[in-house]
Amino acid sequence: MILYKREEYLKRIRGFYHDTEIIKVITGVRRCGKSSLMLTIKEELLNNGINEENCIFIDLDSRKYNTIKTDKDLEKLLDSYDNIKGIKYVFIDEIQNIQNFEEVINAFRIDGEYSIFITGSNSYLLSGELATKLTGRYIEFEIFTLSFYEYIEMKKFYKKTIDTNIISELNNYIIEGGFPKTIQYDSIIDKRTYTRAVVEEIFEKDIKKRVKVRTIETFN
């Protein structure tokens, strides 16, 4: 699938693509498009002449990598790429799935042959633990759900029908919450079902784990 380029964010990150001294940390709520943004960065590197073997995408939610659970597992995996010549561009999706990942990531940063990009849930990466353990050698790029402008442009990109009444489109945008995947669905029922599922996931996995909720019925 051809990816829509979220240029607003890409232009902020491009200057750091080849920087091996800085870890690029992409944060944002669940399903806001962090993984797709990293895939877009990888695509741009390949289009600019970087070899495929030098672009290493590790999705820790995928079957291929779901056995990688600890810092030692991650270290062993990254060590397996040592024989690749030149800078290794490493993309790690959902980094919070790895226990004590910070020291390993920092060690490979110090080696100087790795340009590292990581994504993860706000509930962990914005907790202050990241800043402490990565010793300030990172830059955070916070990603949001689609702006209304992006929402319209993305619908154009994927050749989706756009209502001639801009207010109607704005209402659709508000209902869908700006989550990129809703654009794939044609049925408003499917869009609402997906959005509700995402919001419930954010509440259960992020909000409830980090803060004490006194009036749960407010979220129902």
Where are these regions (language model features)?
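N-terminal pre-Walker A segment at the start of P-loop NTPase domains
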Residues: 1-16
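Interdomain hinge/linker elements that couple catalytic modules in large macromolecular machines
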Residues: 3, 149-220
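Hydrophobic anchor at the beta1->P-loop junction of P-loop NTPases
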Residues: 26
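Conserved lysine of the Walker
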Residues: 34
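Hydrophobic positions on the alpha1 helix immediately C-terminal to the Walker A/P-loop
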Residues: 37, 41
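Short glycine-rich substrate-engagement loop in P-loop NTPases that contacts/grips substrate
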Residues: 56-85
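Structural recognition of the conserved hydrophobic beta-strand(s) that form the central parallel beta-sheet
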Residues: 115-121, 142, 151
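Short regulatory helix/loop adjacent to the ATP-binding pocket of P-loop NTPases
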Residues: 124-140, 155-156
